[in-house]
From Swiss-Prot:
Cellular localisation: Cell membrane
Source organism (scientific name): Drosophila melanogaster
Gene coding for it: Or56a
Protein name per the record: Odorant receptor 56a
The entry's keywords: Cell membrane, Membrane, Olfaction, Receptor, Sensory transduction, Transducer, Transmembrane, Transmembrane helix
Keyword Ubl conjugation: no
Length: 419
């Protein structure tokens, strides 16, 4: 059981240049709370209610899918929506269970960023600003399609409810094929909409609102954590190449140090680099443990769903609205898989450059004990760093394999349908 005081963040954390936007949405959701917030317990309870409602919506959507559809065109978009909610339900439940780990990672990251902003030089500040701009761009790329899809669904529902009420409330006509049902009406397993207005009509509105916020919010937040790790590795590589002992003590004047004093301070700098590398490794391990289950679920679910949507687009005759939603779903799913595999690849490649940074630091000017120490540090830096989601490695090769696998199964389904 969580203790409220263990889940509170300092007010300055919500102004963090990398995580600030996501934390403000998390605060609205009730996932985190501020130390200066009134009644934080009520906020955290709200998170429990919203997470439970996501699972309830997912269960209702899956129940509707299991009832089946008369043809592929009617069920493709609803099936894709239900499966998307199943994937996000797994991710949100995992996030809820491991909320203390998320808070711990945020505290570590915010503390590091605050220290960096105080001691960074111009080049390091440029890296921080570039990381901030990058995370905002990625967030927009995932958020905008989700919001557009949600607004289109809301607009379609409002327009047809006001001007084409028979396509919304005349269920017998819809079942006879005389009227085409709106997407929201197809999500939940209820018969007469008028008898279940609150649950059957307003319920999907509420579920859709949760979906278009929760799905991009969590995935882009994890992207920020991964990009933060990449930033830390970039700065570590830069500092290793510079080998500037004045970072330890700004009052040092290198020209006035004796050989033994210079060796001492360089040794201290080596120790700081090793400690920093170990801290980064620990952070990556914690992050990997946090995301391994939902990313593995996304790997399986999205692979099947991408294949199914291509099959539905090829074999069926979807409406223009269904075409739009299918393409949005394909883009969002591919984008979610890509951000995990791409940023894991960036982390691994940036870590692999650390041994080269040690080699480029002017080692030939060091005393022999330092050169021997540097050899061991290079060997330590060459230890591979990999990110895994249970059974699969997170890298671009895996992402390409997902695309190949989905296309292969799509061709198999299409061939079996033709014959």
């Amino acid at each position: 059981m969580f203790k409220v005081k263990d889940l509170l963040l300092s007010p300055t954390t919500f102004e963090d240049p990398i995580f600030g936007t996501h934390l403000r949405y998390f605060q609205w959701y009730g996932y985190v709370a501020s130390k200066d917030q009134n009644r934080p317990l009520l906020s955290l309870i709200r998170c429990t209610i919203l997470t439970a409602s996501i699972w309830l919506s997912c269960a209702l959507m899956l129940a509707r899918v299991f009832r089946g559809y008369e043809n592929l065109n009617d069920g493709a978009t609803s099936y894709a929506t239900a499966v998307q909610y199943f994937a996000v339900s797994i991710a949100m439940f995992n996030a809820y269970v491991q909320r203390d780990k998320v808070i711990s990672l945020l505290r570590v990251a915010h503390s590091d960023i605050q220290n960096l902003m105080h001691e960074a030089d111009n080049r390091e500040m440029e890296l921080l600003v570039a990381t901030q701009a990058y995370t905002r761009t990625i967030t927009l790329l995932i958020w905008i399609p989700s919001v557009i899809a949600g607004l289109m669904a809301y607009s379609d529902c409002i327009y047809r409810s006001l001007f084409l009420p028979k396509s919304v409330f005349n269920v017998p006509a819809v079942r006879r094929g005389e009227e085409h049902p709106i997407l929201l009406f197809q999500l939940f397993p209820f018969g007469e909409l008028c008898d279940n207005f609150v649950v059957g009509y307003l319920g999907p509105w509420y579920a859709l609102g949760l979906g278009i916020t929760a799905i991009p919010l969590w995935h882009t937040f994890i992207t920020c954590l991964m990009k933060y790790v990449n930033l830390k590795l970039q700065i570590l590589n830069k500092r290793v190449e510079e080998m500037d002992i004045t970072r330890l003590n700004s009052k040092l004047v290198i020209g006035r140090l004796t050989a033994s004093e210079l060796t001492f301070w360089q040794m201290q700098l080596f120790k700081e680099f090793v400690k920093e590398q170990l801290r980064i490794r620990k952070f990556v391990q914690e992050l990997q443990y946090l995301i391994c289950v939902p990313v593995m679920a996304d790997f399986i679910i999205f692979s099947v769903l991408i294949c199914f949507l291509f099959f539905a687009l090829t074999v069926g005759v979807p409406s223009k609205m269904d075409y739009f939603f299918m393409f949005i779903y394909l883009f969002v799913m591919a984008g979610i898989l890509w951000i995990y595999h791409w940023h894991a690849t960036l982390i691994v490649e940036c870590h692999d450059e650390l041994s080269l940074a040690y080699f480029s630091c002017g080692w030939y000017n060091f005393e022999m004990p330092l050169q021997k120490m540097l050899v061991f540090m290079m060997m330590h830096a060459q230890r591979p760093m990999k990110m895994r989601a249970l059974l699969v490695d997170l890298n671009l090769r895996t992402f390409i394999d997902i695309g190949r696998g989905a296309y292969s199964y799509f061709n198999l389904l299409r061939s079996s349908h033709l014959y």
